[in-house]
Regions:
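Positively charged n-region of N-terminal signal peptides that target proteins for export
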Residues: 1-6, 84
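Mature catalytic domains of secreted/periplasmic carbohydrate-active enzymes
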Residues: 23-406, 416-435, 445-446
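Bacterial N-terminal signal peptides
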Residues: 6-16
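Intrinsically disordered, low-complexity Ser/Thr-rich linker and spacer segments
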Residues: 436-440
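Short, conserved beta-strand segments of beta-strand-rich sandwich/propeller modules, principally
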Residues: 410-414
Length: 447
């Protein structure tokens, strides 16, 4: 109930602010769709790259593997879902088709697919099994459907060499998307990667109009952060400058953008591979690496999409499963139990902690239902003697800011919004004593 009341109060405050400024009223800032809000809440997803190149040792499928050797005989969708849960993730993105064009579902568009595998006598369906397992475990499912298709002669973005070839491939790709959305949905997010030229918006509008389209040429999507290292810049705004039909281009976003299109950080648990290779366990990112990535993505308000690499048998290797669990456990250890927490409206929000406790982190979150409004803020701590001292300054808050600083003993914390694009609603202000190593790059103190 309090969330509904708080949301209504925020809308009332925004209307009052508009009336107070007089003259030409500013445009109301963009706000996320309900689907985007759910995506923000998930914060962490797991990517799963599996294709025939796991039998070849390369990053791209050269189509040299005999079809009777493409045999994920130990694939268990429940194990993949367990990996998602262990990592503390809320969704998965499955690469149902990568650049080679191999389709991991029962498609009518090509024989270069799982239906020509000996697995389950050609009746196996990785995507179908994952869809059922995700529904059962309440994990949201998304799909990467690569526009490039070497089998069909379509290059980057789905671009064919001749007009007649382009028309033929457009029909194939649109049919593949239709099959996925019709037979395996609902989908949480569709990954099209950058530069897709195949017209698909009408298919999405007909079958799944609210879906999050990564790098899609449509509103209500998500965008690439600009690197594959798992690090977001700071600030990394949730809005961009966008025109209908364009692919999102602003990795860091823009505070005055006209479209809500948040960034997603993708990175593989293997360096530098997106796909499994023999003997790759030694290249799994360390727990220290993963925690740094978490601070530099989720800790900057950006979703993290962490890639796992199932092997040639379709199984997530035990070493990766163990590291994913370590990662999830470490995040929970750090941030599951705040010393104190509060929420509220306005430019000043105080949090009483007690009779002087040591803290080294503050987490701040805006209520994104009314948009992203904070433009500059500072966090202060009140020492036991009553003196307020500045702990850190920042610009963006957005979905979440994990703000570390040197350990200090305080009785209270105060958030002061110094600049904003309208009345501010803070959904969370929490103080923590993490007392664990913090990545150097996570510390910041804006002017």
């Amino acid at each position: 109930m309090w969330r509904t009341i708080r949301f209504c109060m925020g809308l009332f405050a925004f209307s009052a602010w508009q009336c107070a400024v007089g003259g030409d009223l500013p445009k109301r800032p963009p706000v996320p769709t309900p689907e985007q809000l759910a995506w923000h809440e998930a914060e962490v997803g797991l990517f799963f790259h599996w294709a025939p190149n796991v039998y070849q040792g390369g990053e791209g499928d050269d189509r040299s593997t005999p079809r009777d050797k493409i045999h994920p005989d130990r694939f268990n969708a429940t194990q993949w879902v367990e990996a998602v849960k262990a990592a503390g993730a809320g969704y998965m993105i499955f690469v149902a088709k990568h650049v080679g064009g191999y389709c991991a579902w029962q498609t009518s568009t090509t024989d270069y697919s799982i239906k020509t595998s000996p697995w389950k006598n050609g009746r196996g369906d990785l995507l179908g099994d994952l869809a059922r397992a995700c529904r059962s475990a309440e994990v949201r499912l998304g799909v990467y459907l690569c526009p490039r298709d070497d089998t069909q002669g379509a290059g980057d973005g789905g671009k064919a060499k001749k007009p007649d070839q382009q028309e033929a491939y457009n029909q194939i790709y649109r049919q593949q998307l239709t099959e996925i959305l019709s037979n395996y949905g609902p989908m949480f997010e569709m990954w099209f990667d950058g530069g897709n030229i195949v017209p698909i918006n009408d298919v999405i509008d007909r079958l799944s109009p609210g879906i999050i389209a990564f790098q899609g040429r449509r509103p209500g999507g998500s965008r690439w952060v600009g690197t594959e290292h798992g690090f977001a810049p700071y600030p990394c705004w949730n809005t961009i400058h966008w025109q209908p039909g364009e692919t999102p281009k602003e990795g860091a976003g823009a505070p005055d953008g006209n479209a809500w299109c948040p960034a997603e950080c993708d990175v593989s648990i293997l360096r530098p591979s997106w796909f499994w290779k023999e003997g790759s366990d030694s290249r799994i990112l360390s727990l220290k690496d993963l925690i740094e990535i978490y601070y530099m993505s989720v800790g900057r308000g950006v979703n993290l999409l962490l890639n796992a690499t199932p092997d040639s048998h379709g199984e997530v290797p035990a070493a990766q499963m163990a590291r994913l669990k370590e990662f999830g456990d470490e995040v929970r250890t750090r941030f599951a139990r705040p010393l104190a927490t509060t929420h509220g409206e306005g430019n000043n929000l105080s949090l009483e902690i007690g009779d002087g406790k040591e803290i080294d982190h503050v987490v701040v979150r805006e209520d994104l239902r009314v948009g992203e409004r904070v433009r500059k803020f500072k966090i202060e701590g009140r020492r036991p003697d009553g003196e307020w001292v500045t702990l850190v300054r920042g610009t963006q808050v957005g979905n979440r800011q994990i703000v570390p600083f040197p350990t200090v003993r305080v009785a209270a914390v105060r958030l002061t919004v110094l600049e904003s694009a309208g009345p501010v609603i803070i959904r969370e202000l929490s103080a923590f004593r993490v007392d664990r190593p913090v990545p150097k790059g996570a510390y910041r103190n804006d002017p």
